[in-house]
């Protein structure tokens, strides 16, 4: 595999070389082209560099690639910039300007029988203004994610909350409950206090075994619920969700963008 080399001798990853796409983004070339097309439709070409009289050095596909590579690898801006032949400050501007355009589109239409599955995951987050020490003994945020039980596509992400808060309260405070209004929602037993959520039957306090029919339903519930756990694991293949170094207020759009990339890997 050979890199494209610019006139100053700096190695550059380019979207014109399809062999760079999958290893550095997790997307196949066709999926990446879909991503670029969506960003263009959302106004990506019209976004200015931010410096008076200056044009972007990178084409829109290369800027989209930079964002996807950054999220996938979690390299620092000082590492990402030279890979694309730009300064680290230019890499910052690309991520800040295009990242929000990759966000997951809201679900506008839904069948009333479409079941959602929701779960939370801890995202190690260095911005202590939004993070808190959690059960993993790191400063983290609690990110709520919901998928469609049938398609396994991510349909909603919540606003990250401090990692020491329980799922039962974060479900409401993050806004994801509001996004899922009107459809059945499944979750584990940590979502007590949300009567609209379908949870497994609890073992009686007197120690008796559950009736067989309840035990069977719990088995089915657990099997279906595993789908959201698999989705969260796939989302964390974008390594930025394993150690979030950016300002905390950007995590919501980053997580939503990664949800969109995750969906592209399923739908193409």
Region roles according to the model:
Residues 53-54, 142:
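Short, charged beta->alpha transition segments
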Residues 33, 64, 252-255:
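Non-catalytic, well-ordered alpha-helical scaffold segments
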Residues 1-52, 58:
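Charged, often Cys/His-bearing segments associated with DNA-binding zinc-finger transcription factors
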Residues 48-49, 62, 213-215:
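Glycine/charged-rich beta-loop-alpha catalytic/anionic-binding loops adjacent to active sites
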Residues 59-73:
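Short, amphipathic alpha-helical "recognition" segments used to contact nucleic acids or chromatin
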Residues 79-268:
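Short, well-ordered secondary-structure "scaffold" segments embedded in the functional core
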